[in-house]
Amino acid sequence: MCRTLAAFPTTCLERAKEFKTRLGIFLHKSELGSDPASVGKFEWGSKHSKDGRNFSEDVLGWRESFDLLLSSKNGVAAFHTFLKTEFSEENLEFWLACEEFKKLRSATKLASRAHRIFEEFIRSEAPKEVNLDHETRELTRTNLQAATATCFDVAQGKTRTLMEKDSYPRFLKSPAYRDLAAQAASASPSSGSPAEPSHT
């Protein structure tokens, strides 16, 4: 993580600048799919979210709850870009891998994918090792002996909680998201102010 600019003078500043640039692209390009290179494999967006909201409303919804952010393809893409600036994108990538894993129906595919996910994210010294306590790590290892769609539930839940309590608040407070939310608020006909959403 970028704790001090002096420690990573070039990388952190460049990543932060890239994050702001990419969030700007989200607002000005309603069809995100037209530029698939902008956020790599996490760019799925379209000008309307799955619940029918336009992009500006989608952006403003990300601050309402972590669930709304994770349910938005644009939100996931933006959050992933932000996490890359903090060198902690493995948490979201693990969560997404678990979501895809739970959709599998073949026992053979479940077992194969489960071991891949464990090797990539869970085992000690894994390439994208997520921060889990020893008990959770060993429980997950045991679950792999008879892999089911729920074998990562505990680990996924703890990773989600960590993101919600730690990374998500910083994402909302980041200058890049605050600027984007202000622009989205002014562009949205249903929003009168960039202030906190009303609950009437």
Curated annotation (Swiss-Prot):
Q: Where is the RGS domain?
A: 65-181
Reading the lineage from the top rank, the first entry is: Eukaryota
Example of a GO MF term? GTPase activator activity
The record, for InterPro entries, names: RGS (IPR016137), RGS_sf (IPR036305), RGS_subdom1/3 (IPR024066), RGS_subdomain_2 (IPR044926)
* Residues spanning the membrane: none
Q: Phosphotyrosine modification sites?
A: 168, 177
CDD domains reported in the protein's UniProt record: RGS_RGS16
Cite the record's note on assembly: Interacts with GNAI1 and GNAQ. Interacts with GNAI3, GNAI3 and GNAO1. (Microbial infection) Interacts with porcine circovirus 2 ORF3 protein.
User: What membrane topology was assigned to this protein in its record?
Assistant: Lipid-anchor
Name the chain's protein: Regulator of G-protein signaling 16
**Protein function:** Regulates G protein-coupled receptor signaling cascades. Inhibits signal transduction by increasing the GTPase activity of G protein alpha subunits, thereby driving them into their inactive GDP-bound form. Plays an important role in the phototransduction cascade by regulating the lifetime and effective concentration of activated transducin alpha. May regulate extra and intracellular mitogenic signals. (Microbial infection) Gets inactivated and/or degraded by porcine circovirus 2 ORF3 protein, leading to enhanced expression of IL-6 and IL-8 in infected lymphocytes. This would explain chronic inflammatory response of PCV2 infected pigs.
Alphabetized, the UniProt keywords read: GTPase activation, Host-virus interaction, Lipoprotein, Membrane, Palmitate, Phosphoprotein, Signal transduction inhibitor
Question: How is the polypeptide modified once translated?
Answer: Palmitoylated on Cys-2 and/or Cys-12.
Q: Where found in the cell?
A: Membrane
Pfam families given in the database record: RGS
Q: Name one GO biological process term.
A: negative regulation of signal transduction
Annotated Gene Ontology cellular component terms: cytoplasm; membrane
Where does the secretion signal sit in this chain?
none
Lipid linkage positions (S-palmitoyl cysteine): 2, 12
Asked whether the UniProt record includes Phosphoprotein among its keywords, one would answer yes
